Amino acid sequence: MQFTALLAALGAPLALAASIPAAAHNHSMIDVQLAATGNSMIKATITNTGDRTLNLLKFNTIMDEHPTRKVMVYQDGAEVQFTGMLPRYKMSDLTPEYFVNLGPKASVEHSFDLAATHDLSRGGKIVVKAHGMVPTAEENATTITGHTLYESNELTMDVDGKQAAAVEQAMGGDDSTGVIDKRSNIVTSSCRGSQLRVLQTALSNSARLSRAAASAAQRNPSKMREYFKTADSRTVQKVASRFLSVARESSSGSTGRTTYYCNDNRGGCHPGVLAYTLPSKNQVFNCPSYYQLPALNNRCHGQDQATTTLHELTHNPAVVTPFCEDLGYGYQRVSALPASKAIQNADTYSLFANGM
């Protein structure tokens, strides 16, 4: 993936695949236009439509440098399989390189190959679009103070399947191998020093928090409305069921349907990434920064090992179907999601569990 700056800056938004009602002070301040530049190549042009400089966070956005979910791809009305990564980023101690200052009426371009993160081997017509929420900071600052929204044009492309299949997959093709602890599906050969013990503790805490969250979902309608924007019986049942599924997957006595690695062997642990999931493979990988988090964080909505593990497990279709996306990070962004998006947002589950 490559960036071509129209300005001397790069940056971006947060969370793909969310169409979110905007508050008056959070109306759309950027325009995103998609264009096809090759068989499976996309150029996204991002323009600041406002009259003030925007400082945009790049994490999990259409301008993320990493093989994350930048667009939604459909064929014959069905979603094309995503083969890239769904990371959880560290949201504290953000540094300037994670942002872009985009001046009034200025634009940047970002190009990427859909075939590197989607299975386009079938070929034929596809429909591509992007929409989401972008965390923002004040100019030359790194503290998130708000967000803006975007929705791109809808782009139709005719893809040559053989040519697309020849594109190297960003996260590798063959499955990783190693010695697996069948009790939890942890690849023990990927662990060094105390990492196995740390991960086992995180899974145990994830199971405990998930069970408590399932109970809270059923007994605390005010908290359901706070995080999931509704307390109707269908949503309560779905949320509780998903938490119980995460609890089962987290339990050391489970055979497990995901494969969990103590360390990265696919090159996904970029700066700022705590852990990431490959939903196409039901695999989770911890990054070095994961081990710098506390096991549990007593600060409400603070990131820790337990809720990071919980967050990543919701990204796995073997645990939650359809698997959760990264539609909004942090309490303020989660609070801005409507009910239809909150229930599909991974951080909504981790924050709810942390807040109980």
Curated annotation (Swiss-Prot):
**Prosegment location in residue numbers:** 18-183
Cofactor binding note from Swiss-Prot or TrEMBL: Binds 1 zinc ion per subunit.
Q: Where does the record place the catalytic residues?
A: 312
Q: Which reaction does it catalyse?
A: Preferential cleavage of bonds with hydrophobic residues in P1'. Also 3-Asn-|-Gln-4 and 8-Gly-|-Ser-9 bonds in insulin B chain
Required cofactor names: Zn(2+)
- The cysteines joined by S-S bonds are 191-262, 269-287
Q: Please verify whether the record's keywords include Membrane.
A: no
Under the heading InterPro entries, the entry gives: Fungal_M35_metalloproteases, MetalloPept_cat_dom_sf, Peptidase_M35
Q: Give me the segments passing through the membrane.
A: none
UniProt-listed Gene3D superfamilies: 2.60.40.2970, Collagenase (Catalytic Domain)
Query: What's the protein here called?
Result: Probable neutral protease 2 homolog TRV_06370
Please name the source species: Trichophyton verrucosum (strain HKI 0517)
* Lineage per the UniProt record: Eukaryota, Fungi, Dikarya, Ascomycota, Pezizomycotina
